[in-house]
Amino acid sequence: MRILPINSLLRSVNFAPCVTSYLQLSLLIWSEQFGRKAIPWKHANTSGLLDIYGIWIAEVMLQQTQLQVALPYWQRWMQALPTVDALAAADEQQVLLLWQGLGYYSRARRLHQAAQQLQGQPWPQDLEAWLALPGIGRSTAGSILSSAFDRPFAILDGNVKRVLARLTAFEHPPARHSAHFWSLSEQLLDRQRPRDFNQALMDLGATLCTPRQPDCPRCPWQSHCSAYAAGSPEQFPVKESPKPLPLQVIGVGVVLNEAGEVLIDQRLNEGLLGGLWEFPGGKQEPGEAIEATVVRELQEELAIEVEVTEPLISLDHAYSHKRLRFEVFLCRWISGEPQALASQQVRWVHPTGLAAFPFPAANARIIAALLQRFGHSEESSKVA
């Protein structure tokens, strides 16, 4: 096959047909030999059928998570909730507990909601029907439709954006130009083999066209890559100017009663961490001592009076939009019956029983410090 020269067509929205054909074929040939094969939801069962439910769960997990991280979560999920009916019938707390550690917990709640809508219905096979389900955007819908049904729908996840930004040496941050990148992905899609092509495109971004140190010599698109021709593939995609993340200091109270139980509350079903359990606390006000923050927040949120007795742990946790510093204190419960004034419910739990509740990732170190402080092993706290 003749290698086509790099030209200005690769910088425009429209690819020449000969360029499109070359890119499609070269990528598929590369994928047959080097693509990722050990992805369980990509393989048919003994009856020769793909598990559409498993594909759906996987694609939602992969929205904000890399494959190697999501894979063990997917395997545990499929063992516990192997069908859409099982998911629809599950308790939300079980769903959140299975998701614990993956972050962006609204994905789990929306999967649960969508399963209740899908129960007893045939699987949707058009874009609009998938987009109508909770938690499904255009790229996820396209990936499900191409993977499960071999339907010709384009995708645009982070890997694909990076590949296309380098292929065209696009000089602006991709987030501001989604329509441009959707146009590129639509043009390149092999409509005869959409399942294979979309998977190959994701594999290319995940294995060769990586954020750092891309393996350009092995790339099937090297001869047509404008970023490679410019000698600067790592400069693409162009990044937004970094902004310093604001820091919030959170005072947290681990409140103990005379029975040695700790007080936890369940967050409202809103925001990234909705429905999860946590140790109560809140933001430090300007000029306020952190111990006073804990006392005030527990009075406002739970209607209880506590005495701060000793520090337990201090830890930092970063989200995409802010940094949090948790100053955690052991507290003695003095008076007041705990009330869920700013949460769904409150509960007294023995420290060894905390593993039965889904907590945000930042709370794992708090729990570990608590168990160590009172001589409980982490193994004894795990749910069988």
Model segments located where?
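N-terminal strand-loop-strand
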Residues: 232-278, 307
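Phosphate/ribose-recognition catalytic cores of enzymes acting on nucleotide-derived substrates
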Residues: 315-337
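The catalytic Nudix box helix
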Residues: 279-313
